Each structure stands twice: as structure tokens, then as C-alpha cells.
Amino acid sequence: MAQALPWLLLWMGAGVLPAHGTQHGIRLPLRSGLGGAPLGLRLPRETDEEPEEPGRRGSFVEMVDNLRGKSGQGYYVEMTVGSPPQTLNILVDTGSSNFAVGAAPHPFLHRYYQRQLSSTYRDLRKGVYVPYTQGKWEGELGTDLVSIPHGPNVTVRANIAAITESDKFFINGSNWEGILGLAYAEIARPDDSLEPFFDSLVKQTHVPNLFSLQLCGAGFPLNQSEVLASVGGSMIIGGIDHSLYTGSLWYTPIRREWYYEVIIVRVEINGQDLKMDCKEYNYDKSIVDSGTTNLRLPKKVFEAAVKSIKAASSTEKFPDGFWLGEQLVCWQAGTTPWNIFPVISLYLMGEVTNQSFRITILPQQYLRPVEDVATSQDDCYKFAISQSSTGTVMGAVIMEGFYVVFDRARKRIGFAVSACHVHDEFRTAAVEGPFVTLDMEDCGYNIPQTDESTLMTIAYVMAAICALFMLPLCLMVCQWRCLRCLRQQHDDFADDISLLK
């Protein structure tokens, strides 16, 4: 029996190891729906958790509660830059890839990075310009020593963009002086040769290639003190802290390593399917972005979702400006009718073939409290779902319900119910699965790619068409010039004859 025990344990371990496949993008025509069994069909799970891996799980006490911020203004972490170290608050942004800090006086900055005071700063003698839908910044690239006091006990030399000019980038009263882009090099500015901070961290240290975020949105404050108006959270660098979530972690593949792109396969409002072509949900991409406040949806999806939310909450009438994010709605303090607003479920592609899982979002997430206009008698909210022209963006209001694991090493993103999410006694945020879903890869939007040979063929065809149009014109011009020359010769001869007479 003792000799058979190791083989028995080995066999049992093999049964729970996850299987991984490679995702391939396939260009196919739009589908009218997803095939397969109904999404309501739940499949049994063999295990709730994957085997633990050394260094990936455990306690990260020094990193817990290392994020601060204000509702709608982003979450920031304290970082030090240079020698001697200069302390700055840096916005945590999974939707960009540059590490950039204010490096010149600005009305909204209480402090800024002073390169001339750092003995370890190296100028790369290269400029960088980053425009946004609204706002922009430009600066100069360099490198310096960087560390995170409430993070891993390491110091790395990282690329830094020193922001010298900006417009509508810094936010008055936000208390952050820079931005930490945690996405991939492909979207770094000025180009993908600029190594992002997290890549430098992993290469120069023994920190595992993953991080996780717990964003704890503000429940509506009882008064307007600075402390109660703040939000907090945790950024766990290099691992997963099991104390920050409840239940199981469910993973969805990262479709492409630029933004943190995922695939949404279905959307429900209060359990009712929007019944749209699943490609519409991902047109032209779906990303997880902590630097964006709202849940942003493509135009068609936004209109369908708002129509369904309006119908579900029809017991009260709201101005059109509320649904566009232009007007607030207020109720007497403590009387917000959460029950009239529906829950929203997003189904994400699972790691296992033909399986998906769903994350359920509460109205306490997509109705964002606006503290600076509320009084002690009123609770006021802004509708935090908005229209997008650049695809679906799962912003902070979505992430605030969940513990989100950015497992870069295994190219996947995990979701579990956050231990700090806001809820009521009737409903709670949820992560549930698995559900049967077929042909999920077809839901991803593929940007049309045109290779050089195709472009050359098009160029030759266009040149031939131009030549066909130009040839008759050239013949007509030549004929006209010949006739003109003959007429001039005739006229000259006639004049000579008249003179002789």
C-alpha cells in the first residue's frame, strides 16, 4: 500500500491539472447568434480552484490597501523615482503602456518629478506625444530608478516620460501626479520599442509576471469629509491574495497582447438576452481598463442596453440627459430605490473549449455617486454606462465589483467576487459558470489586414485605369496641336501672298 500511494497521488493530481489551448483568430462573416446548448445550462465543475503554484498565491500584507483615489478620478499607488527618491502618487492604468509623470509646474499638481535633482536620471534625448479623445500630454523620455514602497521590495531602472506640457490630462483635486501604464508594449508611445514598466520589473527581478487589482468603490458617504469621499483598494504585484475575494476565480483568455483584450459572448439585462450578433459586443475590441471610469459600449449595444434598463426601471421616469451621463438623479439620503434597477450580466469566453462564465454587475456599480454636488439630505448619482466609438471598455465601475487577476504569464484574466464590493441585502455581484457556448472565437472582431502584395496589385490596377482614361485625352490634345500647327502655316502663307501683291 505504501508503494502504491505515490502513484495514486500522481494520478489524482493529473486529473485536476488545467488543459490549455492556443487561441487562433479566424475571419468569418457575422453570425446571427451563437450555436449550441442554451446558455442557461450549467455544467458540473470538477474543482473550484486550480492547483496552487509557488509564488502565485499567498499573503501580500504589505501590498493590501495600497491604492487610494476619489470616485470617478481613478486609483493611484505611491511610487518613488530617482536618487534620492522623490515620492509621487501614480494613477494605475491597465489601458495604456507608458509610465509618465508630471515634470513641470502645473496648477493641479502639488508636486512633480524634478529630473535635475536625481543623480540616476538618464536622458534618452527623445520626445513623446500622447493624445486622448479629450486631452493630451507631451514630454521627454528618460530612465531612472523606480520603486513601489507598498509593493515588492525591489528597485528597477525603468523608462519614464517626463511630462512637460499637457492639456486636460491632470485632474484638479485628484491627488495623482502621473500615470502607470500596465498594458503591453504594442501600444506604448512613441512606438513598441519602448519597454513598459511592468516588463522591466519582471525582467530585472524575480517578480512573477502577473498582478491583481481589487478596486473598492465608494459606498455613498454620510458626509463630505475627505476620508469618506475617498476610495481605496489593493494592487498585488506578482501574485494573488486569497483574502481579497470570495468564491472561485474564473479565467478568460487574453485575446491579443496590446490592451487587455477579452471576448464578450453574451449580454443580459435582468436575465434577458439582448439577442445581438456577438461580434457587436466586441466591435472593434473589448478591453479591461482601470484607467476608464465607466462601462463603455459600442453604439448599437449601448442603445439596446439603455432601452432594456429603461424598461426595467420604468416605475420611475428619468430625464434623457441622465441616460447620456449629462444629468444627475437624486433621492433623499438613504432612500435610493436600488431594486428598480436591473443587474447586468456579461458572459466572457472561458478557458475550456465551448464554455463561458458570467460576471453580474449591480446598479450600485453602474450608478456612480457624485459626492461633490450632494448634500446631507440627498444622494445623487451619475449613469456610468456610456457610448463608445472604440469598442467595449470594462472600466473601474465594473472592476469595483470584482477581484481581477492579470495573469500575463498564462495570457489570461481572472475574475472573482471582491471582498469589498458594495451590495444590498437582496442582490450581490456574482461570478458564475460554466455555461455551454459554442463558436465563441467567432465573436471576436478581426481588423481587416491588407498585405503589401495586395496593395501593389491595387496600385497597378489603379494605374491601368488612369492610363485608360489618360490615353484618349492625350490623343485629343495631340490632334488639337497638329490642327493648330496646320492652320498657322496656312495663315502665314496667305499673308505672304497678299504682301507680294
Curated annotation (Swiss-Prot):
GO cellular component: axon; cell surface; dendrite; early endosome; endoplasmic reticulum lumen; endosome; endosome membrane; Golgi apparatus
Topology term for the membrane: Single-pass type I membrane protein
Cytoplasmic side stretches: 479-501
Covalent lipid adducts (S-palmitoyl cysteine), residues: C474, C478, C482, C485
Residues modified as Phosphoserine: S498
InterPro entries named in the record: Aspartic_peptidase_A1 (IPR001461), Aspartic_peptidase_AS (IPR001969), BACE (IPR009119), BACE1 (IPR009120), Memapsin-like (IPR033874), PEPTIDASE_A1 (IPR033121), Peptidase_aspartic_dom_sf (IPR021109)
Membrane-spanning intervals of the chain: 458-478
All copies of domain Peptidase A1, residue ranges: 75-416
Region feature Interaction with RTN3, mapped onto this chain: 479-501
Compartments it resides in: Cell membrane; Golgi apparatus, trans-Golgi network; Endoplasmic reticulum; Endosome
Active site: D93, D289
Intervals, Extracellular compartment: 22-457
Catalytic activity: Broad endopeptidase specificity. Cleaves Glu-Val-Asn-Leu-|-Asp-Ala-Glu-Phe in the Swedish variant of Alzheimer's amyloid precursor protein
Main location: membrane
Enzyme class: hydrolase
Propeptide residues according to the Swiss-Prot or TrEMBL record: 22-45
Gene Ontology molecular function, alphabetical: amyloid-beta binding; aspartic-type endopeptidase activity; beta-aspartyl-peptidase activity; endopeptidase activity; enzyme binding; peptidase activity; protein serine/threonine kinase binding
Disulfide bonds: C216-C420, C278-C443, C330-C380
Keyword Lyase attached: no
UniProt-listed Enzyme Commission number(s): 3.4.23.46
Residue positions where N6-acetyllysine is found in the record: K126, K275, K279, K285, K299, K300, K307
Record's note on what induces expression: Up-regulated by the Ca(2+)-regulated transcription factor NFATC4.
Written domain comment of the UniProt record: DXXLL motif is required for a proper endocytosis and retrograde transport to the trans-Golgi network, as well as for regulation of lysosomal degradation.
Subunit structure: Monomer. Interacts (via DXXLL motif) with GGA1, GGA2 and GGA3 (via their VHS domain); the interaction highly increases when BACE1 is phosphorylated at Ser-498. Interacts with RTN1; RTN2; RTN3 and RTN4; the interaction leads to inhibition of amyloid precursor protein processing. Interacts with SNX6. Interacts with PCSK9. Interacts with NAT8 and NAT8B. Interacts with BIN1. Interacts (via extracellular domain) with ADAM10 (via extracellular domain). Interacts with SORL1; this interaction may affect binding with APP and hence reduce APP cleavage. Interacts with NRDC AND NRG1.
Protein known as: Beta-secretase 1
